[in-house]
């Protein structure tokens, strides 16, 4: 059981240049709370209610899918929506269970960023600003399609409810094929909409609102954590190449140090680099443990769903609205898989450059004990760093394999349908 005081963040954390936007949405959701917030317990309870409602919506959507559809065109978009909610339900439940780990990672990251902003030089500040701009761009790329899809669904529902009420409330006509049902009406397993207005009509509105916020919010937040790790590795590589002992003590004047004093301070700098590398490794391990289950679920679910949507687009005759939603779903799913595999690849490649940074630091000017120490540090830096989601490695090769696998199964389904 969580203790409220263990889940509170300092007010300055919500102004963090990398995580600030996501934390403000998390605060609205009730996932985190501020130390200066009134009644934080009520906020955290709200998170429990919203997470439970996501699972309830997912269960209702899956129940509707299991009832089946008369043809592929009617069920493709609803099936894709239900499966998307199943994937996000797994991710949100995992996030809820491991909320203390998320808070711990945020505290570590915010503390590091605050220290960096105080001691960074111009080049390091440029890296921080570039990381901030990058995370905002990625967030927009995932958020905008989700919001557009949600607004289109809301607009379609409002327009047809006001001007084409028979396509919304005349269920017998819809079942006879005389009227085409709106997407929201197809999500939940209820018969007469008028008898279940609150649950059957307003319920999907509420579920859709949760979906278009929760799905991009969590995935882009994890992207920020991964990009933060990449930033830390970039700065570590830069500092290793510079080998500037004045970072330890700004009052040092290198020209006035004796050989033994210079060796001492360089040794201290080596120790700081090793400690920093170990801290980064620990952070990556914690992050990997946090995301391994939902990313593995996304790997399986999205692979099947991408294949199914291509099959539905090829074999069926979807409406223009269904075409739009299918393409949005394909883009969002591919984008979610890509951000995990791409940023894991960036982390691994940036870590692999650390041994080269040690080699480029002017080692030939060091005393022999330092050169021997540097050899061991290079060997330590060459230890591979990999990110895994249970059974699969997170890298671009895996992402390409997902695309190949989905296309292969799509061709198999299409061939079996033709014959």
UniProtKB/Swiss-Prot annotation:
Localization (cell): Cell membrane
Q: How does it sit in the membrane?
A: Multi-pass membrane protein
Among Pfam families, the record links this protein to: 7tm_6
Q: In which tissues is it expressed?
A: Expressed in olfactory sensory neurons in the antenna.
Superkingdom of the organism of origin: Eukaryota
Extra remark beyond the main annotation:
The atypical heteromeric and topological design of the odorant receptors appears to be an insect-specific solution for odor recognition, making the OR/Orco complex an attractive target for the development of highly selective insect repellents to disrupt olfactory-mediated host-seeking behaviors of insect disease vectors. Odor-evoked OR currents are independent of known G-protein-coupled second messenger pathways.
What protein does this entry describe? Odorant receptor 56a
Question: What is the originating organism of this protein?
Answer: Drosophila melanogaster
Gene (UniProt): Or56a
């Amino acid at each position: 059981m969580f203790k409220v005081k263990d889940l509170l963040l300092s007010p300055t954390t919500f102004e963090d240049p990398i995580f600030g936007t996501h934390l403000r949405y998390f605060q609205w959701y009730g996932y985190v709370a501020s130390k200066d917030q009134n009644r934080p317990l009520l906020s955290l309870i709200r998170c429990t209610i919203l997470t439970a409602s996501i699972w309830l919506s997912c269960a209702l959507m899956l129940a509707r899918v299991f009832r089946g559809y008369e043809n592929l065109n009617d069920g493709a978009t609803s099936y894709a929506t239900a499966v998307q909610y199943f994937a996000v339900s797994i991710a949100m439940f995992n996030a809820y269970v491991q909320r203390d780990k998320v808070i711990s990672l945020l505290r570590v990251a915010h503390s590091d960023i605050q220290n960096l902003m105080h001691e960074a030089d111009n080049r390091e500040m440029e890296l921080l600003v570039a990381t901030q701009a990058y995370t905002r761009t990625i967030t927009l790329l995932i958020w905008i399609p989700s919001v557009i899809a949600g607004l289109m669904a809301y607009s379609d529902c409002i327009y047809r409810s006001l001007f084409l009420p028979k396509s919304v409330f005349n269920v017998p006509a819809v079942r006879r094929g005389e009227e085409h049902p709106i997407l929201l009406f197809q999500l939940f397993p209820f018969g007469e909409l008028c008898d279940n207005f609150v649950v059957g009509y307003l319920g999907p509105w509420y579920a859709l609102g949760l979906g278009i916020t929760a799905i991009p919010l969590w995935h882009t937040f994890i992207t920020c954590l991964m990009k933060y790790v990449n930033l830390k590795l970039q700065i570590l590589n830069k500092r290793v190449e510079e080998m500037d002992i004045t970072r330890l003590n700004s009052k040092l004047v290198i020209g006035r140090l004796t050989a033994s004093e210079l060796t001492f301070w360089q040794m201290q700098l080596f120790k700081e680099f090793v400690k920093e590398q170990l801290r980064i490794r620990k952070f990556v391990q914690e992050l990997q443990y946090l995301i391994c289950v939902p990313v593995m679920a996304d790997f399986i679910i999205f692979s099947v769903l991408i294949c199914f949507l291509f099959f539905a687009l090829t074999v069926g005759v979807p409406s223009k609205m269904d075409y739009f939603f299918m393409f949005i779903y394909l883009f969002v799913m591919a984008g979610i898989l890509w951000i995990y595999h791409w940023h894991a690849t960036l982390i691994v490649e940036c870590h692999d450059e650390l041994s080269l940074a040690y080699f480029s630091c002017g080692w030939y000017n060091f005393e022999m004990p330092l050169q021997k120490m540097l050899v061991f540090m290079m060997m330590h830096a060459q230890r591979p760093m990999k990110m895994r989601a249970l059974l699969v490695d997170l890298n671009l090769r895996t992402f390409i394999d997902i695309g190949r696998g989905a296309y292969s199964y799509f061709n198999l389904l299409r061939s079996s349908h033709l014959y």
